[in-house]
Amino acid sequence: MQKVTIQEAEHLLQEIMSEEDDRFQILIKDERKGVQKLILKWYKQKELAQKEKEKFLEMSKYENALREKGLTYIAGIDEVGRGPLAGPVVTAAVILPEDFYIPGLNDSKKLSEAKRERFYGEIKAKAIAIGVGIVSPQVIDEINIYQATKQAMLDAIANLSCTPEYLLIDAMKLPTPIPQTSIIKGDAKSISISAASIIAKVTRDRMMKELGEKYPAYGFEQHMGYGTKQHLEAIEAHGVLEEHRKSFAPIKDMIQK
């Protein structure tokens, strides 16, 4: 291989998968600083990819153990929106195929919005089934947020296109005959729960952005209904909306004034 430009070396390294590649052996002997920087970057990317693969395998242990018992339809379930002062609580149930692989998958709260959106599209395209459950602020006020979250999770299961054989749930127990395991911080320990957290988060964020367009003075598209200074000041200035949870402090106190 004749001497290549720095740009050509960069393109080659994008194609090269292994140190054993003859082209890599030539590039690694190239003493130009630009090429050596690219080699270092290549090693760092490989190290990151390996760490992501190991993390993904670790997060697949619950699903793999159940598959070894002959189960196929394993649903991960998670919620988003228990804490906000406005908007619904949203849950998702996701059944993934055995060959599912998205490196970098993690708890939705630890991902950037751009990454969540990308993963959302990939999960939607690859999942065996996805069900979403949405419970309104009015119902939250009637039955409390804990019961509303359980109801939303049961709705998400009911909205799946196939019946799950097993449930992996983030920190909840559900009143259903389907066998289940509750996992504390499950969105960082199970790929199915992590996928569900991403579906639920993106679904709810999109709903809150629509609310932001409907009520521009409240800034819902920025705080997603959480009790930020901006949100509380907007409530003081413009009043409580039907989308607010009237059983939540400080909304409850504002109404009683």
Swiss-Prot record:
Predominant location category: cytoplasm
Residues the entry annotates as binding a divalent metal cation: 78-79, 170
Organism annotation: Bacillus thuringiensis (strain Al Hakam)
Cross-referenced NCBIfam families: PRK00015.1-1 (NF000594), PRK00015.1-3 (NF000595)
Keyword Cytoplasm: yes
Domain RNase H type-2, residue spans: 72-257
Subcellular location: Cytoplasm
Residues spanning the signal sequence: none
EC number: 3.1.26.4
Family: Belongs to the RNase HII family.
GO BP field: DNA replication, removal of RNA primer; mismatch repair
PROSITE patterns in the record: RNASE_H_2 (PS51975)
Role of this protein: Endonuclease that specifically degrades the RNA of RNA-DNA hybrids.
Superkingdom of the organism of origin: Bacteria
Protein name per its UniProtKB record: Ribonuclease HII
Cofactor comment text: Manganese or magnesium. Binds 1 divalent metal ion per monomer in the absence of substrate. May bind a second metal ion after substrate binding.
Catalytic activity: Endonucleolytic cleavage to 5'-phosphomonoester
